Amino acid sequence: MKRISGAILIASSLLVTSSIANADQFLRMVSGPSGGSWYPLGAKVMQVMETSIKGVSTSNTSGGGISNVMSVDGGDAEIGWTYAHTVANGYSGKGKFKKAHKNVRYFATLYPAAFQVAVRADSKIKGFEDMKSANISPGKPKWTGTAFCESIIKDYGYDFNTIKKNGGVVHMVSYKESVALMKDGQADVFMAATSVPQASFIELENSPGIRFIGLPKDRIDRIVKNNPGYIYGKIPASA
């Protein structure tokens, strides 16, 4: 699979937890969307816990980086997948969080994830400056990838409402639905904060063919500075 190496934003995937289950207790995990890497990994983690800890039953349901912090804090789950900067914002009530969520704790740091932005190989879109009237699919509300997108286009001087006013569409849907929209030509851009490589992008590379959108150094320098927790990264050409 050919990929252009370009500047991207990455963050560490980690698990956050509230109180851990005791014996004869049900342990609930909120992970990621179907089609992403978090959901199958979350299912495996829960399987291992259930077989290794006597008296514990488990479940794994889909979620998003922002909503998972809220679910754990609110007692709807005991363990949730998120990103380092997302849970830090949630704990302190910053960013997309309207209040502080103090009933969360770090449980484990797993691996870095990249915010990836792809267009069809024949697209005229060369950068974020060309997306002001595009049909984009950045993820669902309360997903960290959606927040990534908003922070980037904010630096370019527009937002989701601007896109809509200009005749574009913001599809807030799942990875699976985003892939279908890209294949049908109903979405011009697919964005996701996920592992590298990732199944949805591999599927789109096979058909209809895609290329990735990066950020110029001066732009990414400013975005990283303005968003604590963001770090630099590149998609390897061999990925």
Residue ranges, per PLM feature:
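Bacterial N-terminal signal peptides that target proteins for export
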Residues: M1-I8
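Cleavable N-terminal signal peptides
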Residues: I8-A11, I20-A21
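N-terminal signal peptide c-region/cleavage motif recognized by signal peptidases
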Residues: V16-S18
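Extracytoplasmic
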Residues: D24, I53-G55, G64-S67, G74, ...
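Bilobed "Venus flytrap"/periplasmic-binding protein-like clamshell domains
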Residues: D24-S57, A113-D184
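Pocket-flanking alpha-helical
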Residues: A43-Q47, S59-K99, K176-L181, V196-E205, ...
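Pocket-lining segment of extracytoplasmic ligand-binding domains
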Residues: A84, K94-G95, S123, D159-A239
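A structural signal for short loop-to-beta-strand junctions that line the ligand-binding cleft
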Residues: K98-L110, S238-A239
